[in-house]
């Protein structure tokens, strides 16, 4: 299992030199952030990013993410040009030595949280989600949730939401299938492994359909194009926020098939009301048995890439919520410690 750390490029407040100092850290997960969604990522930009990462003594093999344009998800006629661009981006990433591409198929928003800095009993802060707060929002008046204000202008957001009123889960499945049948053969030819990320949280939000939320959804996606190039990013926190999901069992099933190409490992504390907050990685801090999840990866012989996912803000750190240095570093060494113990006692 190869440890990686997400880095948001030159604007990330965390220097690569600090990331390299985490014991066992070998890889960076990043992306090209200044290209408009739907346009081809230029090879020279990819190579420049790779050179920056390698100059710090780290490797760049996983991209997170190559965004999927809304026109593809909506099934608009413009999708064919956008899919062709996506195919070329896959080719360019392969030419630069990338092995895994993480992506998602969530309509409109990649993630949903109602708080970016919920204070915990120990004084740290975390990302959190309140079902009640989301249900009380009148989408016709706009959506003012953390992380969303700069995503869309009000009129643009309302127009996009209106377009999705005609898209139910069945149609979104059709559009995902069309997309996969177009890109997976290209990925396979290039030696790239595509890894779809689950919905976060794994439930419909604001009437928008969600189709990557549970075991049956994941199995259906893999069956659309049944090849190792069509795989999963298995995010324990995203899937684990749904009480219907047994993350350990998912790792054993899909990891045993060799279809998990990228692992996001984090803990969440969930409530009967469907609320959750992101905790420290330690099993006792949340609702997930992280030790059992890591053991499942070990038992199936997982040799892919993983990263400690979102962390709390601790020790006075400020920066991008969920993506501070300190707590993610603690998560990394916690996971690596368990992995080493399993290796030496196997």
Swiss-Prot record:
The keyword Lyase belongs to this UniProt entry's keyword annotation: yes
* Reactions catalysed according to its record: D-mannonate = 2-dehydro-3-deoxy-D-gluconate + H2O
Question: Which cofactors are required for activity?
Answer: Fe(2+); Mn(2+)
Q: In which pathway does it act?
A: Carbohydrate metabolism; pentose and glucuronate interconversion
Task: Identify the keywords attached in UniProt to this record, alphabetized.
Answer: Iron, Lyase, Manganese
GO BP: D-glucuronate catabolic process
Any Pfam family matching the protein: UxuA
One molecular function GO term is: ferrous iron binding
EC no. given is 4.2.1.8
Q: Does the keyword Lyase apply?
A: yes
Q: What does this protein do?
A: Catalyzes the dehydration of D-mannonate.
Which family, according to UniProt?
Belongs to the mannonate dehydratase family.
Protein name, entry field:
Mannonate dehydratase
Gene name per UniProt: uxuA
């Amino acid at each position: 299992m190869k440890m990686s750390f997400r880095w948001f490029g030159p604007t990330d407040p965390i220097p690569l030199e600090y990331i390299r100092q985490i014991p066992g850290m070998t890889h960076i997960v990043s992306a090209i952030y200044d290209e408009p969604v739907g346009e081809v990522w230029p090879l020279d930009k990819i190579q420049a990013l790779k050179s920056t990462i390698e100059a710090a003594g780290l490797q760049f093999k996983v991209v997170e993410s190559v965004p999927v344009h809304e026109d593809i998800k909506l099934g608009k006629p413009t999708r064919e040009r956008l899919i062709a661009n996506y195919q070329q981006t896959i080719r360019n990433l392969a030419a630069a030595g990338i092995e895994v591409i993480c992506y998602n198929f969530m309509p409109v928003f990649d993630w949903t949280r109602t708080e970016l800095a919920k204070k915990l009993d120990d004084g740290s802060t975390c990302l959190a989600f309140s079902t009640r707060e989301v249900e009380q929002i009148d989408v016709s008046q706009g959506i003012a949730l953390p992380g969303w204000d700069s995503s869309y202008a009000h009129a643009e957001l309302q127009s996009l939401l209106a377009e999705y009123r005609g898209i139910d889960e069945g149609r979104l499945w059709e559009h995902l299938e069309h997309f996969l049948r177009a890109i997976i053969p290209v990925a396979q030819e290039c030696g790239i492994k595509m890894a779809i990320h689950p919905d976060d949280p794994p439930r419909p939000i604001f009437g928008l359909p969600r189709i990557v939320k549970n075991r049956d959804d994941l199995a259906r996606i893999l069956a659309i194009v049944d090849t190792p190039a069509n795989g999963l990013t298995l995010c324990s926190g995203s899937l684990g926020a749904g009480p219907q999901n047994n993350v350990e069992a998912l790792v054993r099933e899909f990891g045993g098939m060799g279809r998990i190409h990228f692992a996001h490992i984090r803990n969440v504390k969930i409530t009967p009301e469907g609320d959750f907050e992101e905790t420290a990685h330690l099993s006792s801090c949340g609702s997930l048995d992280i030790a059992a999840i890591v053991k499942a990866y070990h038992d199936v012989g997982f040799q892919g890439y993983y990263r400690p996912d979102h962390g709390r803000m601790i020790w006075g750190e400020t920066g991008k919520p969920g993506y501070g240095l300190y707590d993610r570093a603690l998560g990394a060494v916690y996971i690596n410690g368990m992995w080493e113990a399993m290796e030496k006692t196997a």
